[in-house]
């Protein structure tokens, strides 16, 4: 069973001849990772397309269109980042840094309550490199705007407010955590975070380069019940 592939790869087919080969593969000796100890190779396979839709399917065209869509999304993200980069520059220049080094711009002043320490707050966020490149958001419209929309994430209900612990000991980058703790329910802010209060010299995988200054848009939508 491969549940990690659910919703990602869907292949439907039926073996019409050669069931004995499948039985042999199923009984092949396996290693500790449940893989055959010796490589099993398909030397020839014949796919029979039944039905009008199946016969009309053009794999080469679909393959080429996929990469065209990727290029369009990439261009969309680059253009959106350019606009946001200029906005970041103007805004940051007018803000005064807090003692830690972060700068906070109040976008919306909410009328909700101030969370108590150790409560879970529901948060919408969008994280950017300082050049305006979006690296992550749980807001569907933002990811669409920057060509980052993920259909799998959407199917898994990943575009919704995420619970974060409202406490100084939360496992968040320091700059994000400090900004979050200044907020009450309904507040929307934009916080400029120096790399030392972000992911520092290490960066984060291939998403955030080392020594990257970051910008986050943060909104507390509610307190988790």
Regions found by a protein language model. Give the residues of each.
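Cross-family detector of peptidyl-prolyl cis-trans isomerase
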Residues: 1-225
């Amino acid at each position: 069973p491969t549940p990690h592939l659910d919703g990602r790869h869907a292949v439907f087919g039926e073996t019409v001849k050669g069931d004995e080969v499948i039985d042999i593969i199923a009984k092949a000796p396996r290693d500790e990772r449940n893989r055959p100890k010796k490589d099993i190779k398909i030397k020839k396979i014949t796919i029979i397309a039944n039905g009008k839709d199946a016969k009309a399917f053009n794999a080469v065209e679909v393959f080429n269109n996929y990469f065209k869509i990727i290029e369009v999304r990439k261009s969309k993200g680059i253009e959106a980042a350019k606009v946001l980069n200029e906005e970041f520059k103007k805004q940051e220049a007018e803000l005064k840094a807090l003692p830690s080094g972060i700068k906070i711009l109040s976008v919306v002043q909410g009328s909700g309550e101030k969370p108590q320490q150790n409560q879970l707050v529901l948060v919408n966020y969008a994280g950017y490199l300082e050049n305006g490149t979006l690296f992550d958001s749980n807001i569907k419209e933002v990811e669409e705007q920057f060509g980052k929309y993920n259909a799998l994430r959407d199917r898994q209900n990943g575009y919704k407010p995420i619970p974060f612990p409202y406490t100084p000991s939360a496992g968040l980058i320091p700059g994000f955590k400090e900004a979050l703790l200044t907020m009450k329910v309904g507040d929307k802010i934009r916080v400029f975070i120096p790399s030392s209060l972000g992911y520092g010299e290490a960066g984060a995988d291939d998403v955030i380069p080392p020594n990257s200054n970051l910008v986050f848009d943060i909104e507390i939508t509610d307190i988790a019940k």
